[in-house]
Amino acid sequence: AIEKAVDALEPDLILCHHLYLLTAMARERFKEQKIYGFCHNTDLRQMKKTGLWRDYIREQIRGLDAIFVPQSAQKEGVMEIFGIGAGKIRILGMGYSQEIFCGPEKPDNAARGKDGAIRLIYAGKIAEKKGVKSLIKSLSYLPYPRDGLKLSLAGGAGNKTEYQEIEELALKAPYPVEFLGKLPQPELAKEYQRSDIFVLPSFFDGLPLTVIEAIACGDKVVVTDLPGIQDWLKEQAPGAVVKYVPLPVMRNTDEAVSESLPAFEKQLAAKIEECAREEGQRRVDLSHLSWKNICKEILKSS
């Protein structure tokens, strides 16, 4: 399929997402083509955890003409895992759809409800490693009356058994938990606009695009203190209301040590409560992170 596309389009530049097997195969097959690779952090996790063709992938990725990473933590990871010099790696950030993810036309309208309840939202895979179980458990540490808070979970199931366990946890939660399923982007944007706080308690992530989308829609944010995320958000989204939760004790890159989770969940609840006391999210200019501007940055390197 790739060969057919290259033969038909005769591209000047090939963009390959994910520094893993398919990108490595493209580099080997199209030796004369200029190829840029894009790191999404999960590729670094795969290289650490999986031995599948690791040496082959490492060799071919080194041959890419340029590599783009979300932020400095991934740059360091690419240098370490692939043995690539800093000069070939460019920090790009993340692009989001500015036309879809934006504040409501009337910020003071009923989009966020008039019942006085604090609306929390999570978006992503409904999975334990994304911290969803811990998010639901953290609700038990919050001080509000039952009708004072609501949690919405947007996203599809990763593992069916795990999803069922999360559903069972939600039934026991002290506040209503709504499963929205996997939403098209315009619908997800509306849910952000109806919410007050976006919570991402993920145990492993690069630069989560959902954080940017939520800020663009006017949400305050509670997120785990992922490597490099504080510095990046302070630079790219100055003034945004963001609270950071220290990660639990980790092993094997993305697995939380179970004994450390109760303390993590208490800290998560404390940050949600702290965030709720803050005034509403300030308008933050994220136009420099639009796909149009991201594309301009990529083409500058060609």
Where are these regions (language model features)?
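Conserved donor-binding/catalytic core segment of Leloir-type glycosyltransferases
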Residues: 112-130, 136-139, 152
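Aromatic "clamp/platform" in nucleotide-sugar-dependent glycosyltransferases that forms part
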Residues: 203
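A charged, aromatic-enriched C-terminal amphipathic alpha-helix characteristic of glycosyltransferases
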Residues: 256-302
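Acidic anion/phosphate-binding donor-loop and adjacent secondary structure
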Residues: 47-51, 79, 96-117
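Carbohydrate-associated surface elements
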Residues: 73, 95
